Amino acid sequence: MKTITLNIKGIHCGCCVKNLTQVLTELDGVQSADVQLEGKANITFDENRVNVAQLIEVIEDAGFDATE
């Protein structure tokens, strides 16, 4: 397992946090996602099943901007 912190723009409220957490944790290979209102997400994932580019893509598909 690997844990990374991504910077996320566009998080405005608790609903954004909840929705983004759900989107990430539903992704195959993601063990946990701690999304913070301040625009950070700590994500623990299995590198053999998902990569950082896929995590960023899912975040962007949900309407947010993400960078490492």
From Swiss-Prot:
Give the superkingdom in one word: Bacteria
Name any one GO molecular function: metal ion binding
The protein, known as = Uncharacterized protein HI_0291
Pinpoint the HMA domain residues.
2-67
Q: Which UniProt keywords apply?
A: Metal-binding
Q: Tell me the Gene3D superfamilies matching this sequence.
A: 3.30.70.100
Q: Which SUPFAM superfamilies match?
A: HMA, heavy metal-associated domain (SSF55008)
Q: Which residues bind a metal cation?
A: 13, 16
Please name the Pfam families in this protein's record. HMA
| CDD domains xref list | HMA (cd00371)
Q: Which organism is it from?
A: Haemophilus influenzae (strain ATCC 51907 / DSM 11121 / KW20 / Rd)
